[in-house]
């Protein structure tokens, strides 16, 4: 997917309301299934939502994922999921954000959506004087050739689910057990390793502000969690 330039939405512009749900630490599968249910059930007037979570250790294989890119998972489970992209790792210390947005309401296409997420990440890192960039044909955000944030999205009936993972202050060893995003030997890094803060809350606040700015959203925090039960 090629990078597409996108102008940020001014923070002074009146935005569209979106519910912000902080799920804390959760296993991957219940959140994935809840995203699917939300997207399947939403209608024309359903308010957008943004979910924030830290996952327990898991490798996920996207729709383009090849099992041979999972080299030595060991005790970490591997899940085949319905997002785009290849294999990645989620674990504690990684900030995962799932924007559940109606692209028709926002009047943007998929390329602009991806570009806006990448720009929000780049602008977040700039807060700590970390210079990041896109790569043509390889969605995500990179610092000095090392990947610091991955994207894996799905769009159904014009509505997005899945999202981004941002390495904040985490154990990066599990990435050595896979070919991250399908690239052999791809280096990964984290905000902490680059001199940024170790606290998740500080990074979370800046990233959510940048995402709201890019998409013209007014995030409305709610303590209510989605139904995270798994089907029997």
Swiss-Prot record:
Q: List the EC numbers from the record.
A: 2.3.1.181
Gene responsible for this protein: lipB
Pathway given in the UniProt record:
Protein modification; protein lipoylation via endogenous pathway; protein N(6)-(lipoyl)lysine from octanoyl-[acyl-carrier-protein]: step 1/2
Q: Which GO terms describe its biological process?
A: protein modification process
The family database entries (CDD domains) matched by this protein are listed as: LipB
The entry's other comment says: In the reaction, the free carboxyl group of octanoic acid is attached via an amide linkage to the epsilon-amino group of a specific lysine residue of lipoyl domains of lipoate-dependent enzymes.
Task: Keywords in alphabetical order, please.
Answer: Acyltransferase, Cytoplasm, Transferase
Which chain positions carry the site (Lowers pKa of active site Cys)?
147
- Catalytically driven reaction(s): octanoyl-[ACP] + L-lysyl-[protein] = N(6)-octanoyl-L-lysyl-[protein] + holo-[ACP] + H(+)
Binding annotation for substrate: 83-90, 150-152, 163-165
GO terms for CC?
cytoplasm
The UniProt entry, under HAMAP family, shows:
LipB
> Which protein family is it in?
Belongs to the LipB family.
What domain of life does the native source organism fall in?
Bacteria
- Protein known as: Octanoyltransferase
